[in-house]
Amino acid sequence: MGSTRFFLADLPTRTSESDLQILFQDYGHVEHVDLKRKEQDGATKVIAFVTVQTDDAQYCVNELKWQKLHGEKLRVSLAKESFLDRLKREREENQRREQGEPDESEVRAPSSQLLVQSGQNKRRVFGEDEEIGDDEVAPELLITKKRAANSMHNGRIVIQQEHDVKPLHVIEQHRKAAKQKPDANVSQAEQKRKESLNKMRQGHQQKKSAIQQALSVISVEGSQAKRIKFSDAEEEEASKPVQKAKIQKRDLFENDDDEEEEQIVLPQHKGKKGERLVEMQSKQSIDPRFRITSNFVNEEEEAELEDQPEPEESERKWHMNILEQVVGHAITSANDKDGKSPKNKKMLRFDPAKEGHQKLMRQKQPKEEEEKKEETSSTKAKTADAGNSQASAVSKTAFYIVTDTLRDSLNTRGEGFSLLDMFGSAPEKEVAKRQDQLEKLGHEKILVGKTSANKLGLATLNPFSYDSSDSEDETEVKPKQEQEQEQELEVSKENKAQPAKKSGQKRNKNKLESFFIPRNDPRLKEGAKFFKSTKAVVDHAEYDQVKNRLKLLITKKIAKAKKSLPSKDIKLQRNKKGKN
């Protein structure tokens, strides 16, 4: 007896090793029970490995599947061999082979009773009304009380033999109907039906094969298919012996010339009809079966194409050609430009966005450039006269000096490049000229108009602008303004008296003011006065005058106020009336 290992899955949580030993002890000696618990997702799973000494392990598995443990069915299967058991088994097999002993599988094959025993007498079907005595039933088919509850399956009692896997005894409610033998007429009709179906299939396949053979003859390159030519009976009889003679005279070694002679070349139509055919064929498929032939071209179309007259030249052109032959050269008329009709002429529209149309724009040159051009033209004329007077001409070729030593050449390169040396004077001379100009501007006087004086705050301030005595002060302010105007006129005369330098360029009409503020600028003096914290000097004479004016104003205002008040007599009358 060999030991086999069973695997039990999804066991109830309250199962123990003793329960499994009681369950398996009926089938053989229980060597080892290994119970394992595993927690997964909050639920405990219980599995077990049981090693039992049995001769038929498959029988145990099939019978245990029908039994229950703690109200749940068992899931039993043969466990895989462990690594150590497999090594042990392989070693034992190798030792037996070395000793010359047969394998266990060869020894156990004849001992299996499943193939030897036949199941004809071990399976019996009972009806509902039949009664069976205890003596008639074999002891192998009896069910013990212990396993009676677990032997029910789908409302039937299943009795299993020890060495048989399949159910042996099944009690059913109804007997199975015996198979009736087919009638002779029915079998003949069935045979006829099958024969007709086979004939239909064969005919369909023959049609398919015929179509395939026809297509295989026609090549894709457009080779001509075999064509059937209909002719009279007399012509057929005359042609038959000729074909036989040709067949008989075949040589053993055929030449390529014979194949070329067999090819038939169809005549292609020429002229306009042929062009029409080619145009129609180009629109169709390449397959030669659907090729368009000359029959598709209608006779009416041919007549139309032939009747179309060729375009005659106009009378004017004919006359022009005669004139050209007489004159001897081509004549181009104003109307004919590149053979285009005057209807197709279009007016050229000016579009300033396009680059080509910008050339049509007239570009206005400023006056200064025109004057410069005139000056340059005059200077060029003078230089030309001077050049003619010179006897010897100077060559314009450039010369380069190349030093022998590398040191000298590097020193010359380090000098650098300056535009002042080439086109202008040295910077020191320019600075000296600039300083002289600034000194001259510093001594000149700057004219400031009335509007600019108001902007700068240099206008005379009137402290009594809010007073009604402006009319009295106008007489005093006017002589001051007249004095300022006289000073401006004198300064302008002095500036005019200075001699003006002659120059080729025109003078600007607007007078320029220097960028730098001169020392004698009145704005600087007023600024200094504003920031100085000196005590105000008061003129007593002016103070007395202002005081007298204020007194007069106040007295006038008091007099006006008194006049507007009611008289004393009127007040007294009102008081009396109020008392009454």
Curated annotation (Swiss-Prot):
Residues recorded with modification Phosphoserine: S231, S468
Biased composition (Polar residues): 110-120, 386-395
Any one of the GO BP annotations: mRNA splicing, via spliceosome
A Gene Ontology term for the protein's cellular component: nuclear speck
InterPro entries linked to this entry: Nucleotide-bd_a/b_plait_sf, RBD_domain_sf, RRM_dom
Organism of derivation: Drosophila melanogaster (Fruit fly)
CDD domains: RRM_SF
Biased composition (Basic and acidic residues): 89-100, 348-358, 365-377
Region of interest called Disordered, as start-end residue ranges on this chain: 89-131, 173-211, 254-316, 333-395, 463-520
Bias-annotated ranges (Acidic residues): 254-263, 298-313
Molecular function GO terms recorded: mRNA binding; RNA binding
Name of the featured protein: Probable RNA-binding protein CG14230
A Pfam family reported for this protein in Swiss-Prot or TrEMBL: RRM_1
Keywords: Phosphoprotein, RNA-binding
Residues modified to Phosphothreonine: T475
Highest classification ranks of the organism: Eukaryota, Metazoa, Ecdysozoa, Arthropoda, Hexapoda
